[in-house]
Amino acid sequence: MPAYAVWFGINFLMPDFTKVALVTGAGSGIGRTVALGLLGAGYQVVLAGRRTEALQETVAMAATSKASALPVPTDITDPAAVRALFSQTEQAFGRLDLLFNNAGVGIPSAELEDVTAEQWQRVVQTNLSGPFFCTQEAFRLMKRQTPQGGRIINNGSISAHVPRPNSAPYTATKHAVTGLTRSTSLDGRKYNIACGQIDIGNAATEMAMRIAEGVPQADGSIRPEPLIDPSIVADAVLYMASLPLNANVQFMTVMATKMPFIGRG
């Protein structure tokens, strides 16, 4: 009989063998919630992020055996650090079945011409270069492991579709992530590597709580927007991850029903 795990009321088919996932940005927000969801579904999970204490807090929140969670403090903008992260993953668990490229940053709302070079580079390095470096290492590991293959899920954001006012760095990098997702999906086919993207609307995380208080709209007004619980995002990622490798959710958008997305921009 197949085994099932229950996460926020949804049943997910447990893998026939213990699968290994790596989540970036696992110390808070979406990354933390997804990492806990994967642990609850029976995965062994490598938790990557800049802050050691935050990663340890995530592990402490897990209801499963702490032996299934490996926190690895990592700066994903540093290729050498990313190589070390994937090396530790292979040494600890022997393989990698799922990479969730989640880590991302933004900057305060700013007129396009006022964005500094340092701000631009920080967003580009974290939101685009970091996922690319992680994808490279995931490819290398997934290609050589037995059985070959795995799945990569990129966190694209609603901003991969349409911008908010005064958000050029974040919007540009999230559009670029869509290109990375498509290229990864194409280049991974022959190695049984699937790649999809989840584009998330406003979720109730520390990074996005200001949205509930009011943010600039395309018409120049400032209005609050609805948020969804991060557990809804975790459920969506778990569904994408639960598919066999011969099936793939290429793009999924999840957001509050009343979020001003259609018609925005």
PLM region spans:
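C-terminal helical subdomain
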Residues: 197-198, 216-262
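The beta1-alpha1 cofactor-binding region of Rossmann-like NAD(H)/NADP(H)-dependent oxidoreductases
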Residues: 73-85, 117
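Conserved glycine-rich Rossmann-like NAD(P)H-binding loop of the short-chain dehydrogenase/reductase
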Residues: 41-57
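Residue(s) in the substrate-gating loop at a strand-loop-helix junction
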Residues: 157
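Substrate-binding pocket helix/loop in short-chain dehydrogenase/reductase
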Residues: 110-112, 119-121
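Conserved glycine-rich cofactor-binding loop
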Residues: 27-29
